[in-house]
């Protein structure tokens, strides 16, 4: 069938299989063109492996270091006239290309927060790898979590803490810049967001992997966070998500102590740059900030996407054969170019004057839109979007059954 983008609010409800495959192919080509990673990881588990930083780290591990990879995610196969989710198509393309290159690549589709999926993953690691996982990437972005032990349901929210936040935001599709006010979160919303987006599940994963002897001596585990400039702090760093990320950082310190003493391992937080993702598109203020950031970083020739960021994380931080450079809080900073003084000063200056009339020229909102559509496989060169495509795509390692998530 012919697949066109259908955008509702912050998400696109369709995905293009060939476009997603082309996008994954571009990332793979980038990883292959860079000099290969020496001393890189060999057996990598990526939790949240189908889009964004998780997918990019899977590609860098596989095609940059020749690593075997297992990816865990929660995606939807095609059903009737409904396309699969982009992460499904991304993984189908990744696995197909990895297998053709002689690389081990298997995936598990289901709720990463559940004990059942953790056990399935452990069983696969024991059966196929006999343990020995030397890198665990934790890259989950989810709006809700069911606690595996208590059954309690938590929903995350994106709100300020303490007082109403007033600023401006942009409707990315129309280019309309307007004032926005966001009411503060309740105590329950703060706690719930921490339960979903904090470090609780990361710790459950690492403890389970350790208990069943799945981790190698010297293992590294990395989770991602974002800090950003003062401009976004009220809604992000000092808001509910920021509170959850502080919990994630606290978890990293605890896991680091455990892994260091048991396996000479490390648990690390990587602070990444602001990028267009399905998650960031839903945050008020942030799309307008990213549109300005893209413009300035592209002009200075320091713009990076997910794949460039993950390449730099692996090459210059995790596997540089030197001590991993961190900030005073022990975090890896690959948001260093975004947070450069000259970049931030320019954004601050433009922020005051940006409005509906000048947003298309002052910012790179066109680049934001382009990246947004690319997430769903649209707007890629060399794809004929007027031609019908087969929307059912198989992921080689996954058997689709009616019980699989819809």
UniProtKB/Swiss-Prot annotation:
Enzyme class: oxidoreductase
Entry's EC annotation: 1.3.1.9
Residues forming the catalytic site: 236
Positions annotated to bind NAD(+): 48-53, 74-75, 111-112, 140-141, 245, 275-277
Annotated Pfam families: Eno-Rase_FAD_bd (PF07055), Eno-Rase_NADH_b (PF12242), Enoyl_reductase (PF12241)
Coiled coil segments of this chain: none
Gene3D superfamilies registered for this protein in UniProt: NAD(P)-binding Rossmann-like Domain
Reaction catalyzed: a 2,3-saturated acyl-[ACP] + NAD(+) = a (2E)-enoyl-[ACP] + NADH + H(+)
Binding-site residues, substrate: 226
Record site: Plays an important role in discriminating NADH against NADPH: 75
Keyword NAD set for record: yes
UniProt KW keywords: Fatty acid biosynthesis, Fatty acid metabolism, Lipid biosynthesis, Lipid metabolism, NAD, Oxidoreductase
Gene Ontology terms describing biological process: fatty acid biosynthetic process
Pathway noted in the entry: Lipid metabolism; fatty acid biosynthesis
GO function terms (MF aspect): enoyl-[acyl-carrier-protein] reductase (NADH) activity; NAD binding; trans-2-enoyl-CoA reductase (NADH) activity
General function of this protein: Involved in the final reduction of the elongation cycle of fatty acid synthesis (FAS II). Catalyzes the reduction of a carbon-carbon double bond in an enoyl moiety that is covalently linked to an acyl carrier protein (ACP).
Family (UniProt): Belongs to the TER reductase family.
Subunit note: Monomer.
Protein name: Enoyl-[acyl-carrier-protein] reductase [NADH]
Species, as recorded: Coxiella burnetii (strain RSA 493 / Nine Mile phase I)
